Structures are given as C-alpha cells and as structure tokens.
Amino acid sequence: MTDANYDNQELKNAVCTQLNKNLVSFADAMQYLEDRGISQEIVNKAGIGFCPPYYNHYQNKQLILSPLMKGRITLPIRDAYGKIIAFAGRKFDQLEQNVELAFWNMYPNSPSEAQARIDQWKRGKWINESFPKKFHLFNLYLAKQMMREKNYVFLVEGYFDSLTLNSFGLMNNVALCGTRLTDWHAAKLSRYCHTAVALLDGDEAGRKALEHMAPTLEEVGMDLKIISLPEGYDPDTYLLKNGSKKILASIELMMRENVDEEIYEVCL
C-alpha cells in the first residue's frame, strides 16, 4: 500500500461519522442489524452506517462513492491502528440478500483524478476497486487488547460473523475479508497472541479453509484450535440461537494444561 492510501484521514472519518448518523433514519437497516444480533454499542464502536440510495454528498470532494454502495449498510475497513482504508457495503433487502460486497475506493490522488473519476461515473463507467485483502484483517483494531489479555484469537470468515462475536463479548476475533489466511496475516496475529481458534462455517468451504491455516500458523509459532459448528450454522447464527456459553466452555477445555496438541478440535 502507498502513502496515498492514508491521505485525507480526517475526511474519511467525517464520512464514516455521517454514514453512521444516517443509519438511525432507516428502520429496515436497523432491524437487519438487530436480527443479526449486532448490538447498538457495536454499531457505534465499529462505525457501521448506511448509504441511502440518493446519497452523493461527497461526490465532489476528491472522494468517489461508487453507485454500488448506495442502499447498503456500510462498514469501515480499518488497519491495525484504526485508520480507515476502505468501506464495504452490504445489501440487506430480501431480493438482493446475497449480493457480493462492493468496495468503495476513495483515494484519488489529486483534484484532476477525482474529476476524471466523476466524469467516468457520469458516463456509467464507475470504478469499483477493492483493497489488498492479504494485508488486512477486519476487526484487528478492536480485537488487539483482548487478544493480548486472552492469548488467543477467533478466526472467522465474514464481517458480520465478526460483528456478532463482538456483540456477544468475544471481541478477540478477526475476519479474513473473503480471502484465505496469508503469511502476513499469521505474522501479524502472532504479535498479539499464541493461539488461533478457527470458528468457521460448518460447510465444505469452511473445512477447506482449515487445510491451509495449520501450516501457515505453524510457520510463525502459533497453535491452531478448531471449534466445529453444527452443519448448517455459521458463527453468527449459532450465537443467536445458543449464545456463547458452549463456545467459551470449549475454549476452556482447549486451554487446559493437559491438552497440548498443536491442532485440537472440539465439536459443538
């Protein structure tokens, strides 16, 4: 990433604040978050917001909001130090529940580049660029303190899995932003704790993700523990139905002195 990615942090924070303020005016978006088990405290702490369908307030301020972000719940993506690097948007209406996350790239390096992007937008050729996911972990900024305290981190797949864990008090978690665990991810996590606890979806994709995790974590001296969810569950749906009691009991079992395997699995 270049230094340009960190320019205009004050403006990015202002956008995040405004999007967060927008949220309270849209009952459907608020209800969706409540149904996902995401508390108001976490909504505010994480800076979750909403981009209305008609929203273009920042179009002419060297900041380009992709039309794909409109009508979506917005999530600021932060680096380990809390700086905003991008936004993700999530459709929440029933007709488009499974639409892929769209990313808002907001780093035009000059007014002329900003104007060029606006012109592209007007011609229907907007830019929908992503950010380098292999160098970032969602929620790391909020998770660091508890990771140090507990000496372990939950690994989850999705942003909303992470946010739901936060709402249940399991703040020591990170989401992989739609990519597999990289060497950079593992090295970064090893700075804060010794053990990774994989809490992945109970499907084939979740199992495949585990195959790569163990050797990657082993390279940096981290242990891998696995909590297997029942079939058909992902972390947020499991927590909504069962709470965190069994998950915490599984962690206690894994951390006992007589359980010293580098890879250890508990089925819920």
Question: Which residues does each PLM region occupy?
Answer:
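Phosphate-handling DNA/RNA-contact segment within nucleic-acid enzymes
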Residues: C51-C193, A209-L210
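Acidic beta-strand-to-loop metal/phosphate-binding motif
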Residues: V153-L155, C193-A205, I227-S228
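Arginine/glycine-rich "motif VI" loop of SF2 helicases in the C-terminal RecA-like domain
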Residues: K188, T216-M222
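Hydrophobic anchor at the start of a short beta-strand
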Residues: N172-V174, A196, D223-K225
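C-terminal or mid-to-C-terminal helical accessory/interaction module adjacent to the motor/catalytic core
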Residues: K225-L268
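Conserved nucleotide-binding/hydrolysis micro-motifs of P-loop NTPases
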Residues: F160, R180, D203-A205, P230-D234
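Short, aromatic/basic amphipathic alpha-helical patches
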Residues: A209-L217
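TOPRIM metal-binding catalytic domain and adjacent DNA-binding surface shared by DnaG-type primases
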Residues: M1-I73, Y81, K144-R148, N258-L268
